[in-house]
């Protein structure tokens, strides 16, 4: 009947196989359990959850069909099958626990070869064979098959680890299996697989939990001629899944007889993978059309086995029947010819069946060669032992003694009876010479075995697997009765080996031995690598079933460990025991793709505690403690006993066990366990030592395999306690029988951002030159400028264009980041420019000599553009300046003037701090660029036109300009202003600049206070002839030392001239001293001299001593003589106060000894004067605010009497009157509009009201002059007001001060005020209607103007004055310098 899937119907239901002959009436709601095998660890694979979990097919069907599961398109349902029936749930108890399952190894019914097309392997048509119905019924009665679908079976306990179950569980399973008969489905009409099943409907999603049957066995469509419709329909997966092993029965199409197959021998080889190409399909060759093959596009390899079937048959028949196979477990390997794929190579097919000991006379083996390299039917593993990633080491090897007959054809070459091992032959195919072609071609006929009187053995179909050609396989054929195994390491290959048809073979029934077999007999007949104990007839079925199950567990564990060690091939180790004579021991390696396990399932199955395992692992630990014995093997493949430590001890007493020492709580992933073994560890030597010690399983790299064998075979308990860390080792532990190769460093992932040390040898010439240039620029200073510049030019930085540009970038970046040395870097650019210009001129001359005189004359007649082209063509053009200016232009265009001052409002406090820091760095770089451009203009490397363009763009905005632009404009103008002012054409631009600046200053609402002061400073700088108060440029050490020495000399010669604004008492002290710190002696004599104020006397503590007073006064007289002149009043005072024992000293100022004595006496009185000044300062601080308010009130009310009354009431002592006078003068200079009122108030207070004496007035204006540095710092243009106020004091009728006093007072603060003092002189002269009158005043009083200038300006006083104002020229024409 045809099964057709209807995509529009309800979710897919399993096909119900109509068994007309034997319908067992199993209910529809029967829940099929997976095969009872607890030794396999479930591969960790999750499936996508379906749209509706209820729609996913929960499990196997109700009927006990034993058809192997398949992968590929979903088979169709037979007509009449109810698709609307409810779907039973699968394992509702624990839906999230993956359950191990394995395909049932029940023979499938052969199909007609005409039922499928070679060109469409995906649409498999399975046809039943009705004549074979009776044989199936007979087989059911003869053999007891595994009741994998019986609804009364014991519930399958889900296992989450690879440990074996308990003995009680196994006994229950085996009893149940022995009591239930197997069932083989009836043959039926072919199943039409249509292309619609390639993409299933949406309702067939993936389960929300992993399906055990789909996890373990990748579902594939049946083979073209031997397939059966699957009992459990597998939802077509939308994504590729991992390969899963499956089992199919092979039926000979010619005789319709099952080819009996046996399990392969346990392979001690390394892990070899036999990948198969996706192109191996039934349509690839005619040969595949006649044999079973994997459908194209599946990409999976399937192994077949029927070992469990034979065991069940043996148990039903009550006889021990080890399935015999070809004498040498023949494997033939020949490379496939490119012309025809009909003759292809089938690799890694080994034959061996676990069986009980048999009699010698009843065993025979045959080997049949095939023209097309036929793989014998007995070359497969058991259903669970066939994995796609690791080899199986669980089956037993059938051996024959000398009396055993062996039949081979003469065409087969006999291999040498020597065990050989080939290690690591990458990508080396098996040569065709390994199997000689038959001399006499034999017809491909099945060799049937003669049946005996015993019940005939049911034939099993041989399983053929399309094998990937990845590792090479060794062929082993036998012609002698005594055979040695031939083992060759397998390496990966890339070619495809198509599947060839299988020959028929009949086996002779084996007579059951009456007596139990002894150890010696077992050694000569059956070798079990898991145990060397003798077995009896009573335990034959249990041992065989356990051995078959063990293969599953070992294969599962190999999959488990293969994940962590996919890059390493485990070296095959030979298994040679003195008491064992194996007849055959061939390499067998299942092929396929590795299974990828999800991290979630791995973590869920791992025990929570390494000391106390929980769940099934705890049961496993209890079983180990009670069921192990001395001969038991641990998970590392070593015996557990008193001498276990000695067995693991290597040379030098070192424990060479890979799992020693146990790592407590070290949860490493599988990739890190034993990935890098001990340095001197030789796996082969260690393997031989273990082999000599009687451990045939030393090469078992599956940790759970030994426990499984020991528990099932009932070994006595061991003497040692199990390792508490074994559960973790069972999960993650990986034991190798060879030294894994450490991967090369180049294969490791590389971080692109890692730091890599620079290798000088790897640099080219230009990079080396740039490195040297950078070293020089890091060391360059103004002091070493000339030397290092020469070294830089000698590197040839102008020869190579790359080096040329790189050097410019280095200089440019340093100039912007180190603005203090900007002048030095511009000088360096000038040097390089001149050097390049000279070098190019020399090269140009050489070019002219080559081209001749005529061409040279033509060159001079060319235009500038043509000359540039000529120079560029002959590489004689200087390009340094062009590249430098281009770099400046690019950097200037990058300045974000609009956003550099803006701070986003939505920033957090910490983000705002970082943003402001970034703004500060950006502003610093902008100002460095502006300064660099200005310095380049001063070096004449930048044209004036470019500078004007920049300045216009910065200040030319009509509306409120950006403050950052105005700041850049002020900095640039302060640098280039002096150079521009010397050009008459630029004076027009400067005039317009200052007019715009004045407009900005006057409009206080548009700009902040800081920017307005900054603009005012530039305007004052222009008025001061562009002379900076502080030179911020870099200086040499000599220049710094000279400046410091000069300042020190000034402090020593004129201590009152030192600016000290932190303490006003020092200013007050300095205002009264001309030669020493004594103050009050200047006040006392005038007070005594003033007859109009007899009541005012100085306090007692201010009474002067004779020596300091005379010294101070004499110093004053000397200064007056220096400027030439003085008034009569001071001359009269000279006679009155030049008295005492030391009076003669005043007439001789050249006596150094006397000067030193006077200085010492002055220093003795400094302490008392400082204490007095401190008290005065405290008093003034208390009343200064009241005085300031009184002055402001006077300016509003203009009431002199009121002001005077306030002063008398607020100021408790006359000692504070000089501070009041200083405050009045400071107010007059600050408020030019109120200057006449302040001057009128001062005159009235001194002369009319007599509030202040003349001496107090002198002390007051001297105190004001000492504060001029602070005034000029705040108001650079205050010199005009100062000159105007003092002009009134000097030229008034009463004569408050003389011209000499005026000159002496301002000379003291020359060093602190800088260029402001000459400006005060110039403005003072300009106050006269005629400068000539001012000159006459200076000449009459013998006052010179040199005291207003520094020494370096003596030579250019007249030039400075005329540049300030041309009206000053008549004055300097009269006054002789």
Curated annotation (Swiss-Prot):
GO terms for cellular component: cytoplasm; eukaryotic translation initiation factor 4F complex. Residues 95-110 have a biased composition (Pro residues). SMART domains: MIF4G. It comes from the Eukaryota. GO terms for molecular function: mRNA binding; translation initiation factor activity. InterPro entries: ARM-type_fold (IPR016024), Initiation_fac_eIF4g_MI (IPR003891), MIF4G-like_typ-3 (IPR003890). Residues 1-189, 259-563, 683-702, 1041-1063 are annotated as: Disordered. Residues 1-57, 84-94, 111-137, 168-179, 267-296, 326-412, 533-549 have a biased composition (Low complexity). Belongs to the eukaryotic initiation factor 4G family. Residues 420-432, 441-471, 480-496, 1041-1052 have a biased composition (Basic and acidic residues). Residues 297-323, 517-526, 1053-1063 have a biased composition (Polar residues). Pfam families: MA3 (PF02847), MIF4G (PF02854). Keywords: Initiation factor, Protein biosynthesis. Probable component of the protein complex eIF4F, which is involved in the recognition of the mRNA cap, ATP-dependent unwinding of 5'-terminal secondary structure and recruitment of mRNA to the ribosome. Residues 1182-1305 form the MI domain. Transmembrane segments: none annotated. This is Eukaryotic translation initiation factor 4 gamma.
